[in-house]
Amino acid sequence: MTIIGAGLAGLQCARLLAPQGLNVLLVDRKNTLDQKIHTTGIFVRRTLVDFDMPDDCLGPPIKHVTLYSPAHRSLELVSQHDEFRIGRMGQLYQRYLQHCLLSGVHWLPQTSYLSHSANNGKLTLRLSSGSSINTRYLIGADGARSRVARDLKLELNREWIVGAESVLHGAVLAGPPRLLCFLDPKLAPGYIAWIAHDGEETHLGVGGYPSLFDPTAALQEFRSRVADIIDLRNAKQIETRAGLIPVGGVLKNIANSTGLLIGDAAGAVSPLTAGGLDPCMRLSAFAASVVTEYLSTGDAQVLQAYSGELFRKRFISRLWARRIAATLRQPQLLELGCAVLRLPVFSRLAHHVFFGRGSFPDVMEQLAAPSAIAH
């Protein structure tokens, strides 16, 4: 079987499938996985508790969040727990790739998927290297604009935001590690601007609907606007990141007898917060369980469990919140909303948004409890 895309979703799925005795080919267009990273890499507490993450691939824990209004009025939130850790994603990808290789996964870098054909239940993949490969099953982990999804005639993402960020060393921010989130409809229409600072590494970024702003220009303006909040005078930019983030929720039709989708290709991102790493890990683990059973039994009924309809029910409120967020383009309305959140009775709502443990439905944990893999 073949997985297209070696981001977090593809790597997680591959390293769970190979130990089941399956012959797994992992294909990615990049030469090395520490190149052209797209995600900020913020892991939430539930992921850190439920999955065995290599500690040396994670930054220091974060339990403080500051939410800023358009006028930079702030709301401070503090959790009793270590809520977030920023992944060193290049290092994490390479570590997970080593797990895959040690488990027998075949690795094909610097290669793009072009198309496939089906004949008598067998798939033939055409790759950019000019070669063709026969495979039993195809998994698309190839991002928000998935070519695999299109060719499998599965559902495609229709709504996304775009994010752009700078990764810095040497930024100075007073106090403990924290996430700073900025509501500003000009710099981040429909989403937020952010500073993720763990005391070692700093991510400064903006996100929003691509038709409403220029991410590069917005990022530069945001950097100048926060000069009184974070000292960047001696900061060294070590990396820039950018990418599409699907925000339409988990897609309904994400599997058939030929292949299935995981990660961003499946829309496995929170519609409200645009956080995708926890859904990615859980959906990939579930996919590995379903594919293993399907290929061992040949029973297509097994695939019915892998339906986006089951997951979307959990996200109804977040889908509505996403629609509301997409329409909030007046700074005055956002300023009023932030003022309300600063009231004690409503600050609990903000606390729940940032620190709540909601993720994919519990059915995923019951059907596919993630296997711990030693690091």
Regions found by a protein language model. Name each.
Residues 15-38:
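Glycine-rich FAD pyrophosphate-binding loop
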Residues 145-221:
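Conserved FAD-binding catalytic core of PHBH/FMO-like flavoproteins
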Residues 1-9:
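Beta1/beta-strand and adjacent pyrophosphate-binding region of the FAD-binding site
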Residues 289-375:
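C-terminal helical "tail/cap" subdomain of flavin- and related membrane-associated enzymes
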Residues 60-61, 66-151, 159-161:
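Conserved N-terminal helical subregion
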Residues 7-8, 143, 278:
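Residue-level detector of alpha-helix initiation sites
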Residues 33-66:
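N-terminal FAD cofactor-binding segment of flavoenzymes
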Residues 113-115, 210-291:
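FAD/FMN-dependent oxidoreductases across multiple families
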